[in-house]
């Protein structure tokens, strides 16, 4: 965004409408947008801007197509799993994601197929919403589109924190399809840890220094014990076949696939995120990360 850009923040709650350097509007989103549209009547972006935007969109589409591709022999990734489901699901199926790396990966790589079909909990990193929220979404979806599926993308970390509504979904006959992507812990926080110059510590199960013998969870058996159908796949090609079986199932279906904790993250489309880094450190890597991070502030609009 240009340094002189202004952001209009719309929210029904006064506290949440007021954001840093924004122009807040307290009110209903639809009514506010209608009013703003009238105020913008006659506005048209310049030809130069439209051409730039269209060119960037073409570049982005090409990047996503390559990012979700399963034809090359690379490690399993979130993006590949997202691409597989996106290509097979019905346009009225609803997807749910929350917490960890999946909200950003879904936002970047999912091509929305229809209105009101994407539910990504982003603001509070609400671990566990993936399954509990999906169950609630399926209850709502059943009112008008009972034949369509609710699909949850869930990491192993969030799954272990809150999974009991798998049982609830089976008990209440509200079928979910859960894509459980196992990266061995909390890999996106491990990535953040590494990106700020730190060594991996206590985010991946394999990096817990107090654990003598780390072990994998049998997610397939666990989901089955709560009444769900479940299977484990080795790669995106097997995931596609399993997803077809999940679509045909009459009850909650969990598909487990390991993904690489280090490779395959979406590298484009990121926004700047202010993360505290120490000004003084014994580690050169941490200090260098702090210096590099400070350099990225040049486009920050502090407002104070």
Task: Give the residues covered by each predicted segment.
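Active-site diphosphate/adenylate-binding microenvironment
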Residues: 57-145
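Thiamine diphosphate
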Residues: 17-18, 24-26, 30-34, 105-106, ...
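Short conserved AdoMet
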Residues: 2, 90, 248
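Glycine-rich, acidic loop regions that bind phosphate or pyrophosphate groups
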Residues: 1-53
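A short, charged, Gly/Pro-tolerant segment at domain boundaries
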Residues: 53-61, 260-262, 271
């Amino acid at each position: 965004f240009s340094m002189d850009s202004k952001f209009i923040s719309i929210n029904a709650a006064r506290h949440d409408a007021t954001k840093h350097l924004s122009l807040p509007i307290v009110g209903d989103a639809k009514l506010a947008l209608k009013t703003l549209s009238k105020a913008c009547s006659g506005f048209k972006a310049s030809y130069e801007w439209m051409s730039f935007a269209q060119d960037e969109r073409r570049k982005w589409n090409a990047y996503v197509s390559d990012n979700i591709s399963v034809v090359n022999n690379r490690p399993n990734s979130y993006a590949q799993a997202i691409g597989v489901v996106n290509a097979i699901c019905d346009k009225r199926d609803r997807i749910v994601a929350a917490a960890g790396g999946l909200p950003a990966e879904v936002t970047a790589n999912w091509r929305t197929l229809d209105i009101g079909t994407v539910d990504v909990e982003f603001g509070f990193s609400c671990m566990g919403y993936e399954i509990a929220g999906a169950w609630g979404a399926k209850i709502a979806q059943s009112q008008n589109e009972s034949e369509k599926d609710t699909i949850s993308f869930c990491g192993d970390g969030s799954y272990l924190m809150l999974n009991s509504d798998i049982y609830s979904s089976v008990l209440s006959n509200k079928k979910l399809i859960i894509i459980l992507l196992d990266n061995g812990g909390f890999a996106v926080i491990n990535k953040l840890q590494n990106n700020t110059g730190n060594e991996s510590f206590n985010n991946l199960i394999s990096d817990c220094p107090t654990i003598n013998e780390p072990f994998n969870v049998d997610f397939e058996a666990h989901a089955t014990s709560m009444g769900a159908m479940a299977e484990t796949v080795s790669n995106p090609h097997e995931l596609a076949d399993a997803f077809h079986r999940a679509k045909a199932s009459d009850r909650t279906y969990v598909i487990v696939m390991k993904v690489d904790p280090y490779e395959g993250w979406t590298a484009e489309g990121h926004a700047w995120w202010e993360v505290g880094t120490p000004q003084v450190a014994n580690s050169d890597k941490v200090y260098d990360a702090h210096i590099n991070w400070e350099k990225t502030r040049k486009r920050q609009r502090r407002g104070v």
